[in-house]
Design a protein with these regions (language model features):
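Conserved kinase catalytic-core segment
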Residues: 102-161
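Catalytic cores of nucleotide-sugar-dependent glycosyltransferases that transfer UDP/GDP/TDP-activated
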Residues: 33, 53, 66, 119, ...
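Residue-level signal for well-ordered alpha-helical segments
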Residues: 3-5, 34-41, 57, 101-112, ...
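A broadly tuned preference for mixed-charge, low-complexity surface segments
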Residues: 78-80, 89, 93, 124-137, ...
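Short C-terminal domain-edge/linker segments immediately following a structured domain
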Residues: 68-72, 110-114, 177-184
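Short, surface-exposed, charge-dense and proline/glycine-enriched linear segments
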Residues: 71, 91-106, 163-173
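C-terminal catalytic region of ATP-dependent kinase domains
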Residues: 143-241
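Conserved ATP-binding subdomain of kinase catalytic cores across diverse folds
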Residues: 1-95, 100, 127-132
C-alpha cells in the first residue's frame, strides 16, 4: 500500500478538534484532485509514525482514514482524509465540566459502543503491535453507525505505552473475557508481512518502523493476555512463589 503525498491549499485552514496537537480542517491537493482533510503540524517523526500506522491499520483491514504526507513551503505535515463524522467524545457531548457521575455514565456508554464494534478486539491487538500510547475517546470516530480509528503519532516507541485503552474499556464495559479471547486470536492472525507492504515516497525510510513492528509481533498474544490480569496473576509473588 502506497503512502501518497500532497500539498496544502493556502488559506483553507479551519481549526477543529481538542487534541494535544490542534488539528485543522483544510483542502489538500493529491494527484491533481482537491480533498478535504484533517491536517496536523507535528514533529517529523510523529508525522511519519502517523502515516505508517495509518497505512498499517488499513492493510490489516481496520477502518482508518487514508494518511497523506503533505509538503507545505518546506515543512512536512500530516493529513488524513476527512471522514466527515465526529469523534466519540463530540458525538456524545463529553466535556471536562460535566459532573463526575455523568462522566462515569458517559464513559460506560462509550465503552459499550467501542466493545460492540466487530473489529474492536483486532484494533486492541493492533494498538499493542504499534505500542499506541495515546488511544483515547477523542480518537475513535463514530457517526452512530460507521466508525474509524485515528491518531497514531504517539506510537512505535516514540511515546511510552502505559496501557491499552481498548482493553481498559473492555473491562469497564464488562466485556473483558470476550475481548481478551478475540484479541488473542486477532494477535495470532495479524499479517506479519503487512509492514513490509507499505511503500513510502522515495524521500522517506520506514525501515526502522518495519523492524519495530516485527519485534512487537513476536509474542504479541502474550502481551495481549497480560492486559487482562487474572486474580492469580495479581497475587503472584506475594507469598514468595
Amino acid at each position: 500500500m502506497k503512502l501518497r503525498a500532497g500539498t496544502l491549499v493556502p488559506n483553507t485552514e479551519t481549526p477543529v478538534g481538542d487534541g494535544v496537537n490542534a488539528a485543522v480542517r483544510a483542502v489538500i491537493r493529491v494527484d491533481g484532485i482537491s480533498h478535504l482533510a484533517i491536517v496536523k503540524r507535528i514533529p517529523l517523526q510523529a508525522v511519519l509514525a502517523e502515516c505508517f500506522c495509518g497505512l498499517l491499520f488499513r492493510v490489516w483491514g481496520l477502518p482508518t482514514p487514508e494518511p497523506i504526507l503533505i509538503q507545505d513551503n518546506g515543512d512536512v505535515l500530516f493529513a488524513s482524509m476527512d471522514a466527515g463524522y465526529p469523534n466519540l467524545k463530540k458525538r456524545l457531548g463529553w466535556n471536562d465540566q460535566i459532573p463526575e457521575g455523568q462522566q462515569q455514565a458517559l464513559l460506560k456508554f462509550c465503552a459499550d459502543i467501542v466493545c460492540s464494534w466487530t473489529d474492536s478486539a483486532q484494533a486492541m491487538a493492533a494498538d499493542e503491535a504499534i505500542a499506541n500510547g495515546d488511544r483515547n475517546l477523542g480518537n475513535f470516530l463514530w457517526d452512530g453507525t460507521e466508525h474509524a480509528y485515528i491518531d497514531h503519532e504517539r506510537t512505535l516507541g516514540l511515546y511510552p505505552q502505559r496501557a491499552n485503552i481498548i482493553a481498559e474499556l473492555a473491562k469497564f464495559a464488562g466485556k473483558a473475557d470476550e475481548i481478551e479471547r478475540a484479541g488473542v486470536a486477532a494477535a495470532l492472525m495479524l499479517d506479519a508481512s503487512a509492514p513490509t507492504r507499505i511503500t513510502p515516497p522515495e524521500s522517506v525510510d520506514f525501515s526502522t518502523f518495519v523492524t519495530y513492528v516485527a519485534q512487537q509481533l513476536q509474542g504479541l498474544a502474550g502481551r495481549v493476555l497480560a492486559r487482562f490480569p487474572k486474580p492469580t496473576d495479581l497475587l503472584s509473588g506475594i507469598d514468595g512463589s
